[in-house]
């Protein structure tokens, strides 16, 4: 009915489980539009739903690694007016390493597009390395947080902004 507030308990009318995350959703949308897409990231032991969604959409999963821990999760609460509230648990999304980033970016270069979102770690390093390789960097800075202050956002060619983050 409404977005829950602190100290409140509320019944839910339904529970739905989907694969997703901004990065995965963008990769799938581009692949369905006919663009060759390589998705990079780290999934946990619970990542089969994500890998299956990639394969079904034609997304190349060569750069997806699996770790023996829980992956990232998102809980989205939607009220009767379709407004939402989103809570993130980073999990494996926060486990990128410089070595992994370097391994992925080694196969890409000038003119290739890199699409990022602020639900992963190492953004400053990823942006710097991609910029040095003259890649085109597209970024959704959501969730807008202090981590972005470590990034040289002047190296980003295009921003994809959500309503709230656009106001910030």
For the regions a protein language model found, what residue spans apply to each?
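Short alpha-helical
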Residues: 25, 45-49, 70, 121-122, ...
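Glycine-rich phosphate/adenosyl-contacting loop at the front of the ribokinase-like
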Residues: 1-40, 49
């Amino acid at each position: 009915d409404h977005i829950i507030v602190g100290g409140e308990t509320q019944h839910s009318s339904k529970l739905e489980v989907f694969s997703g995350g901004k990065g995965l959703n963008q990769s799938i949308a581009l692949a369905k539009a006919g663009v060759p897409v390589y998705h990079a990231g780290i999934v946990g032991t619970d990542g089969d739903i994500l890998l299956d969604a990639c394969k079904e959409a034609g997304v190349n999963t060569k750069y997806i690694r699996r770790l023996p821990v829980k992956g990232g999760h998102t809980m989205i609460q939607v009220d009767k007016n379709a407004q939402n509230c989103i809570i993130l648990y980073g999990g494996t999304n926060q486990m990128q390493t410089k070595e992994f980033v370097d391994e992925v970016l080694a196969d890409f270069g000038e003119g290739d597009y890199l699409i990022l979102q602020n639900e992963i770690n190492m953004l400053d390093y990823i942006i710097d390395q991609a910029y040095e390789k003259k890649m085109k960097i597209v970024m959704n800075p959501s969730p807008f947080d202090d981590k972005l202050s470590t990034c040289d956002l002047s190296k980003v060619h295009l921003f994809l902004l959500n309503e709230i983050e656009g106001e910030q």
